[in-house]
Each structure stands twice: as structure tokens, then as C-alpha cells.
Curated annotation (Swiss-Prot):
PANTHER family: GLUTAMATE--CYSTEINE LIGASE. Its EC number is 6.3.2.2. HAMAP family: Glu_cys_ligase. GO terms for biological process: glutathione biosynthetic process. NCBIfam families: glu_cys_ligase (TIGR01434). This is Glutamate--cysteine ligase. Pathway: Sulfur metabolism; glutathione biosynthesis; glutathione from L-cysteine and L-glutamate: step 1/2. Belongs to the glutamate--cysteine ligase type 1 family. Type 1 subfamily. It comes from Pectobacterium carotovorum subsp. carotovorum (strain PC1). It holds the Pfam family Glu_cys_ligase.
Amino acid sequence: MIPDISEALSWLEKHPLAVKGIQRGIERETLRVTANGHLATTGHPEILGSALAHPWITTDFAEALLEFITPVDNDVDHLLTFLRDIHRHVSRNLGDERMWPLSMPCFIDSEQNIELAQYGSSNIGRFKTLYREGLKNRYGALMQTISGVHYNFSLPLSFWQAREGVADAESGKKAISAGYFRLIRNYYRFGWVIPYLFGASPAICSSFLKGRETALPFERTEKGMLYLPYATSLRLSDLGYTNKSQSNLGITFNDLDTYVAALKRAIKTPSEEYAQVGMKKDGRYLQLNTNVLQIENELYAPIRPKRVTRAGETPSDALLRGGIEYIEVRSLDINPFSPTGVSESQVRFLDLFLIWCALADAPEMSADELLCTRKNWNRVILEGRKPGQTVGMRCETIQQPIAEVGKSLFADLRRVAEVLDAENSQPHYQQVCDELLVGFDDPETTFSGRLLTLMKQEGNGSVGLSLAEEYRKMLSSEPLQVLTEEQLAAASEHSWQRQRQIESEDTMSFDDYLAAN
């Protein structure tokens, strides 16, 4: 069953200030599409600023794949309003284009039409585009156009002071990092609850497969939509962004030094498969290198330990310097029922669940045990809503119904919710528990259940198009609430100045820059 955390919950009830001041951030990806849903072939709109240097509006893999990044925030309402303001501003500046509201792309005629994100003529800009060229040549461009939401989360220092007895972040970095690794291990064990409740990619357009082999038993509608009747998140399946060559890297989440050493090993380990791609063709680079990972960010993971990097610092060097500062949750599909791709209920649920993961005991896990947890994720991803579906506990030695495990978990989450609500004198967190608990008795009320019902009636392309148009009208007509037009114009202008400055300060050739990095 789930770990017994009654003692930890009693401790939390006695130390409510330990969870006052949680910091959060959201990153939301979305494809720019035309009125008929096809991938936009236009460049990143100049009015939105430089994708290289803008603090809030950038691009991910493709020139048409927008990414919105909120600043760190300790207020849920303000965080979501800021994100919505970015959406409002972008909606007003996309002309007749709109933002695709689903994780899975639909109307992409050919991978050749997917232009890689462009970041200007500086070495760092060209490096970023070449990294994407490598991703395209390794995994195919289509897979890289799948969109998601990332949720960044950190517990306040007061939590670690009360729980672990640390004095400050610097002297306590070992204990704090160990605490975040415990959270991560619990996330691997129980994080399947996220795609169960919020997975929103139960179907794909048949064009997405394009002759690719799949052993998945898809059902097909008359309109050509492919779906699995009980699937929750095909984005998280092997059809989505996974890297099979990474599964034997032996990366574990038991302590910082071992984790970083394994990560550094992966970026130095040559790959026979990627060596066959080659480094150059007709004088043009094809990837940054031929190692298993070109850079650390290529590591696929449903959750990542993070620290803000300094200039010239790799993510792992930042972790070694200061320990884990926050974690990045990467298992959220785009929420099609929200104009901004994520809702307040989801944010509040993640707060509760991540606090639970930090409180619950989590024995160290070997690489094999981590692979074992993947079985539960796969079961939920492909057949999560199947009546009587079970998850395996203790590496598959015990099977328990999802509904039973989910309800036990929510009994704990409600106690965490009461602590958080007492601080705000509003029952927001408890309301989220009530709202989501229903999904364990009636899986059709989950995001994937609701969405698949809609898609079977109208087709997934039609659902995407009508939601995109509805949200375009809604967002472009709403006034800004926390940002101003002046702030947005200044951020855009400053980002272009910064890009020009970076370009003018380059001193070495791109070949030399690559060799040095």
C-alpha cells in the first residue's frame, strides 16, 4: 500500500508554517497553427521579442513551438494570472494564427515542414539550433512537437529548518538535496496518479504514426482517429518523448554525487547508434556530438532536480555547487479544458502531492527498481481507466486496485490540504481533493475520459480546432491583469537589444565554440 505517514502528518499539523512560502513556476508549450490547424510556417513573431533572450516568451524545439515561462511566484492566483496575461498578449499578436490546445499535434503534412527554432547568429544561438538539429536526427522532428506543461516547485527554507534541522541553505544543502531526492523517489513510485487524473492524450491523428511501427492495439474511428479506449497519456508512452538508449544509463536518485556522476558519464559516453547519424553532411553539422546525450537537458525524465545556473555553468555543475534548489515536474499534458493549458486545481493538487512526497519515507532505489516503477506508469498511461485496473507495489509483488491506492493517498492529501487551507482561511485545497477524488470511482470524469468522449463524437482534429478558436477569441478580448502593455513592449525591446549585444560580443568561430563546449 502507500507508506504510513501518519507521524509526518501529525508533525505537519504542529508546524503549519513549514509549508508557508512554497515557490512555484510554470512553463507551457504550445504550437502555433493556422486557422485550419496546420503548423504555422511563419517565423517567431518579431513583436513577441527575441526567443533567445526574452524572459517569458520563447520557443522550444520548433520555430512554431511557443514556450511561456512565468517568474517564480509564491501566490497561486498571481502565478496563473501572469501566465494568462502572457497568453492574452500573444493571442493579440498572432494575426490569424492560434495556439494548439492539445499535447499531440495533428495536421502536420511532413516532418520536412517543421522548421527548427532559430536564435540568431551568435554562437550560443547557433548552438541551441544545432542541439535541436541533433534531436531531429536522433528521434525525428514529429516527436519533438509534442507539447506539455512543466511545473517547478520548491519548499521554503522553513520546511527544511523545521524538518531536517538545517540552519541555512548553504550549510544545509546536503540535507535539503537528500530531502528532494526522497521526494523524487516517491514521485517515481506514485506519480502515475498525475497521468491518471490529468493525462489528456488518449488519442492521436493517424498521420502522427506515418508508417511508424507500433505494437499498441489502436482502435480507429471513421474519421481516422487512433485511440486506446482506456489510455490517459500517449504523450508519456513510447510513442511520445522517450529515449530507449537512456534506460540503461543507470541513473538513480539516491544522492547528489552519484546522480551527477551518472549524468556526466552519459554526456561523455559514445553512442554507436548516433555515430551512424554522423557529425557533418555537406559541410553542415548534424548534431553537437555523437554521445548518448548531446547535453544534459536531453535526458528524458518525468521529474528533474534543478538549480538556477550561473553563466557558463552546466545544470549538474550548478547542482554540485549549491545542491537541489527546486524540482521540475514534467508529466503534465496540456490541459485542453483551460485556455492556458493548466488549471488552478492542477497546481493545488501538485502542491499537495509534492508535499506528501517530501514527507513520506522513501527507501533508496536501484536502477532496476526505478525501471520497475515504469511498469505502473505504463499501465496507467495505456490502460489507466480500465475497470478494476491495478498498480504493482514493491516491484510488482503485490497488485492493488488504482481506486484503492488513490483513495488512501487522498485521505493523506486531505490532511495536508487542511494545513494549507488554515493558513489562507479558504478551503481551496480541500475543494480540490473533493473535486478529484471522484475520478477514482468514475474514471470517465478524468481529463482523458472527458476528452476521449468528445473526440469520439467530433474527431480529435475538430476538437482541437474548435477549442483553439474559442480560446483565441476569449484570450484576445480579455484585458491584462498583472502585466501592462508597456512592460511587455519593454521586455520585447530589451530582449532584442540583449540578443544584438550577445551577437556583437562573440570572439571565436562557431567551430571553436563547439570544440570548447
